């Protein structure tokens, strides 16, 4: 259910738009030389992953509350992730958002993606420092 005060509501974002963005973006990710190998090694149920990420973005922009996961531990457990991967992820995501969404919707998706990436990078850095200290 979409919350009327959700940031995506006034920008015309729909569940169909979110699923289209997720599908188009992850098709690019899977074909990407930088990101593809990491995702292919970790994701074994792509349909389930796409559904989970659709729920994630629905919760972010429509406040649907459908996503119940914890992305930080999942990403922190992948030692290969580096700043280069976040830069590439943001580039592909931004390009895809601009291709499949109207401008106001694309802006919101890109803004939230940047905030999420910064949060994940900070959390991963803390996790890695703690792991190095414990060793």
What is the predicted function of each stretch?
Residues 1-135:
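Core of compact, soluble alpha-helical bundle domains
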